[in-house]
Structures are given as C-alpha cells and as structure tokens.
Amino acid sequence: LNATRNVASIREGGAELAGPNFARALSLNLANNLREQMAVGSFGAAGIGLGQFQATGQIETYFGSRALYQKFLDGTDSALSVRLADSAGNALILDLPRLRFTDADVMASGPNEDVMARLSFEAIRHPTEGFAAAFHRFAA
C-alpha cells in the first residue's frame, strides 16, 4: 500500500479532510506497554505484565484554515479515520473515534513556502464505542 494510490480517504471529525487543509503526512504509534515479569528460578520471563494501551500520532496539513488548530486551542475532542483500499477493492479502515490534539505547531520555513500545521494527538477510549483505536477489514 502507498500514499498515492491506496489512501482512499482521510476523515477528521466525521468530515473528509480536504482543501484548504489537505493532509501532507500522517503517523500513528500504537503501544500495548507489555512488560517482562522476571522471577527467581525461571529461565526468561515468568510472565508478561499487561500495560495501558496508547495510540498517539501526528498529522501534518496545509494551513488553509484555522479549523484544526482551533480544536487544539479549545481542547475540543475530534475523531480520525483513514480508509486504505487496494486495486481489488479490499479495504482497511483505521478508526480513532475519539482523540484530542495535544500539541500544535504552525510554521512557514520561508518566503514562497507553504504554511503548514503539525498537530500531535492521542486517542482516547470512546465512551459508547468502547475502544480508542480499531482496524476494520473489508473484503472485496
């Protein structure tokens, strides 16, 4: 899968993320925070401790309007979904039904350069959906 042919849509807050705030980059980090539980008399780990799930990421968009940046300033929750599809019609949807922007940077590197917004986010467990992040797979 690649970002040119296979990203069918990026939705933020339920609406297509499009002009004037086109997405330029998106990253996602998932961590289960598992840990080894060592014990005397055991070769290797005696167990695996469960950790807290974390989903964080960053989205970079052209700064065509203040809409996303304003959500950061106001502390407003949002949502993000990314639909990936292959040429056969199979699809994978990354679903973050509730997230909060944790940091934002608006920058222009110089004259004749585009103004970009880089927003960091953290997914939060949705109260009715019951999850912070999910992958949904659909066969053609």
Model-derived segments and their meaning:
Residues 1-140:
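Signature of extracytoplasmic/envelope-associated structural regions
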